[in-house]
Regions:
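Helix-to-loop junctions at the C-terminal end of transmembrane segments
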Residues: 70-82, 166, 260-273, 355-356
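Symmetry-related core transmembrane helices of the 12-TM Major Facilitator Superfamily/SLC fold
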Residues: 172-190, 362-380
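Intracellular juxtamembrane helix-capping segments at the cytosolic ends
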Residues: 122-137, 312-326
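Helix-breaking motifs and short loop linkers at transmembrane-helix boundaries and internal kinks
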Residues: 50, 82, 103-108, 294-295
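Structural signature of the two symmetry-related core transmembrane helices
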Residues: 85-99, 275-290
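Pair of pore-lining "gating" transmembrane helices in MFS-fold secondary transporters
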Residues: 14-41, 47, 115, 208-224, ...
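Extracytoplasmic gate region of multi-pass secondary transporters
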Residues: 38-39, 209-259
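Conserved MFS/SLC helix-loop-helix module at the cytosolic interface between two early adjacent transmembrane helices
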Residues: 69-105
C-alpha cells in the first residue's frame, strides 16, 4: 500500500545486506576524506594565492553556498537517479572539484571550484544519508551512527594524508586524497548502482510540522560543532595555553566524537532516540560550561571532549528519524541537513559577533545555554523524537 502523496517505485536491490552496508559506508568514508583534505589544504591555498582573511572567507562562503543550495534540490536528484547512483555521481564530482581547487590560479577560479565542491559534497551527503536510512530500515536496528563514524574516520584520514602530501605542494595535498576517495566510490559503485528508493510524486516539499523540530535540533547541533571547530583553539590560546597545545581541545572533541559514533548504534538501541539526543545535548552543554568555568588546557580538553561525546550521535539520530518522517528518506534528510549546514555556517559567525561585543568566554556560556535548552526540547514530545528507536 502506498502513501497518498507518493507512488513508491519498486526497490532495485540486487546485493546482500552486508554488501549494501559496506558500499554505503565506503561513500561516507570517501565524503569525509574529501572534507578532511580540504580543511588541511586551506592554509596552503591561502598562501599560494596570497589571499587575505577577507578574500579567503569569500571562497569558504562559496563552498557553504554550494552545499546549502544543493541539499534541498537533492530530493529531485535522488528522485531521478535513486539515492545509490546519485551518491556515486556526486562522489566522483566532489573528488574532481577538490582536485580542481588545487589548480585554481585566481580567487575567481577558486570560488568557482569551491562552489562546485560544496554543491557536490552537499548532494552526496543527502544521497548517502538517504541510502543509509533505507538500509537501516531494512536492517531492523539502529546502524546510522556507524555510517557517521566512517565519515569522521575518513575526515581524520583525509586531513592527515592531505597534510602530508601537501608538503609536496597544494595540488598533491588535494588530488592525492581525492583520487583515493574516487577509488572508494568506484569500488562501492557496482553495489550502490542498484540502491535506493525512487518515487513518482513531487520530489521536494517544504518541511512539515514533524520535520521542523528535527531541523531545529540539527541547526543547534551543527552550529555548536562549527563553533567548536573554529573557536576552541582560539579560546584556549586566549586562556594562556601555548599555540602548539591549543589544538588539543579540538583533538579531544574529534576523538571522542569518533568514539561515540563507533558505539552509537548500541546506545541508540538501548536508550532510544529521544534519550540519546536529549542526553547528548545535555552532555554537550555541560562540556561547554566546564570549558567556560575552567579555562586552561585541562579544562579545555575535558570540556570540549565532552562536547564531542555529547554531539556524536545527535546528527546521526536526527537524520535517521528525518529519513523515516519525510515523504521520502531523501526529502526528510534534506530538510534536516540543510538546516544543520546553515547552522554550521552561522554558528561560528554568531560566536565571533558575541566575542567582539563581550568576550569569547561569554560566547561559550551562551552556546552552553543554547545546548541545554536543546536538551530540554529534545527530551520533550515537542522535539519530534520517540522514546524508542
Amino acid at each position: 500500500m502506498t502513501d497518498a502523496r507518493l507512488e513508491l517505485a519498486p526497490d532495485r536491490i540486487v546485493a546482500p545486506p552486508w554488501a549494501r552496508r559496506l558500499a554505503t559506508l565506503g561513500a561516507f568514508v570517501a565524503n569525509g576524506a574529501g572534507i578532511g583534505c580540504w580543511a588541511a589544504a586551506i592554509p596552503r591555498v591561502k598562501a599560494d594565492l596570497a589571499l587575505s582573511d577577507a578574500t579567503l572567507s569569500v571562497a569558504l562562503l562559496a563552498f557553504a553556498a554550494g552545499a546549502i543550495i544543493a541539499m534541498p534540490l537533492m530530493g529531485l536528484f535522488a528522485h531521478r537517479l535513486r539515492s545509490g547512483p546519485a551518491s556515486v555521481i556526486a562522489g566522483f564530482g566532489f573528488a574532481a572539484a577538490l582536485a580542481a581547487i588545487g589548480f585554481a590560479p585566481s580567487l575567481e577560479a577558486l570560488c568557482a571550484a569551491t562552489f562546485v565542491a560544496g554543491a557536490t559534497h552537499g548532494a552526496m551527503d543527502i544521497a548517502m544519508n538517504a541510502n543509509a536510512s533505507d538500509i537501516e530500515r531494512r536492517w531492523g536496528k539502529p546502524i546510522m551512527s556507524s555510517f557517521h563514524a566512517g565519515f569522521s574516520l575518513g575526515g581524520a584520514a583525509g586531513a592527515v594524508l592531505g597534510g602530508w602530501l601537501g608538503g609536496f605542494g597544494t595540488v598533491w595535498g588535494l588530488t592525492g586524497p581525492a583520487l583515493l576517495a574516487s577509488l572508494l566510490v568506484a569500488v562501492s559503485a557496482p553495489v550502490l548502482a542498484g540502491e535506493g528508493h525512487g518515487f513518482g510524486g513531487a520530489s521536494f516539499v517544504a518541511p512539515s510540522r514533524r520535520l521542523l523540530p528535527l531541523a531545529a535540533l540539527a541547526f543547534v547541533s551543527m552550529s555548536t560543532e562549527g563553533a567548536v571547530g573554529d573557536w576552541s583553539g582560539t579560546y584556549l590560546a586566549r586562556s594562556g595555553v601555548a599555540p602548539g597545545f591549543a589544538v588539543a581541545a579540538y583533538a579531544a572533541f574529534s576523538l571522542l566524537m569518533i568514539t561515540g559514533r563507533i558505539v552509537g548504534d548500541r546506545i541508540v538501541a538501548a536508550a532510544g532516540t529521544r534519550a540519546t539526543v536529549g542526553l547528548g545535548a545535555l552532555i554537550a552543554g555541560a562540556g561547554l560550561a566546564v570549558s567556560a568555568t575552567w579555562p586552561g588546557l585541562v579544562g579545555g580538553v575535558v570540556g570540549f571532549g565532552l562536547v564531542g561525546a555529547g554531539l556524536a550521535n545527535v546528527v546521526p539520530v536526527i537524520f535517521s528519524v528525518a529519513g523515516r518522517t519525510g515523504p521520502s528518506s531523501a526529502v526528510g534528510i534534506a530538510s534536516a541537513a540543510t538546516s544543520g549546514y546553515a547552522g554550521l555556517l552561522i554558528g561560528p559567525v554568531v560566536i565571533g559577533a558575541v566575542a567582539s561585543a563581550a568576550d569569547l568566554r561569554s560566547a561559550i556560556v551562551m552556546l552552553a545555554a543554547v545546548a541545554l535548552i536543546a536538551a530540554a526540547f529534545a527530551s520533550s514530545r515537542a522535539g519530534g523524537l520517540a522514546r524508542g528507536r
